[in-house]
Amino acid sequence: MVFFPHRHLIGIKGLTEQDITYLLDKADEAVKISRQREKKTSTLRGLTQINLFFEASTRTQASFELAGKRLGADVMNMSVGNSSVKKGETLIDTAMTLNAMRPDVLVIRHSSAGAAALLAQKVSCSVVNAGDGQHEHPTQALLDALTIRRAKGKLSRIIVAICGDVLHSRVARSNILLLNAMGARVRVVAPATLLPSGIAEMGVEVFHSMQEGLKDADVVMMLRLQRERMSGAFVPSVREYYHFYGLDAETLKAAKEDTLVMHPGPMNRGVEIASEVADGPQSVIAEQVEMGVAVRMAVMETLLVSQNQGPRTDGMKA
């Protein structure tokens, strides 16, 4: 039997191909549960999950909540807007307070990179990173991988083009790490101003043209233009950005006929993607949302149940 040797899920970095495959296989089982009429199980009955979101979220928070509830856990959503954080309490103080309540897992989203890793050092329960600044978003990468694997039957040797605001995207970073670990060919397509320095050292091919970057791609993953994280003029205008880097039906023709169109959400229609593509036959955006619940069920079960059946480490380095 294969064991998952980690107490926390802080990032994709630190996971092996075997770890990733284990979680994806678990998630496949969770998909079956989610498609049943009776979706609730007793797997995590008696265990407590606290969702601690310091950044606004709709999909991710709802997905984690639903995952916990479908496994039978007691789930609490902590509203940061009404919490002691607004009164000046630090993240560490909040962590220590919550830890004293003896939860079994904390799910955290925070605007600062490294927040999840810091939390994991201060609490005695498992920690799941739901996105920390521009660092990582591991469950998003896992759900994207599950979506691709279920549609294509594999992850190795497929060509994935990640397009758009790579610079500010924790989703891009986690996907690059995961896809490389699983043997995929990864391309990034973006203007130079929206690419981090040293991106080529992450094992990706860099393109500045959508036509060139999408050629023969099996998967096209569009990223949102994250204007809320921008402090300067990274693009001349939204209109010009869409002209050169937006995905419409004509641009999509450069990819394979059976290419998958993906987007982590929320989408900016008419900015990075056209409605005709987002709602078109090649889009698997709705499937990504469904796979998100399954992946988070798999992560929760693995950290809180499966890991107790074998040796584990104290966590992963972010």
Swiss-Prot record:
This is Aspartate carbamoyltransferase catalytic subunit. SUPFAM superfamilies: Aspartate/ornithine carbamoyltransferase (SSF53671). It catalyses: carbamoyl phosphate + L-aspartate = N-carbamoyl-L-aspartate + phosphate + H(+). Pfam families: OTCace (PF00185), OTCace_N (PF02729). The keyword Transferase applies. Gene3D superfamilies: Aspartate/ornithine carbamoyltransferase. Belongs to the aspartate/ornithine carbamoyltransferase superfamily. ATCase family. Pathway: Pyrimidine metabolism; UMP biosynthesis via de novo pathway; (S)-dihydroorotate from bicarbonate: step 2/3. Catalyzes the condensation of carbamoyl phosphate and aspartate to form carbamoyl aspartate and inorganic phosphate, the committed step in the de novo pyrimidine nucleotide biosynthesis pathway. One of its GO terms (cellular component) is cytosol.
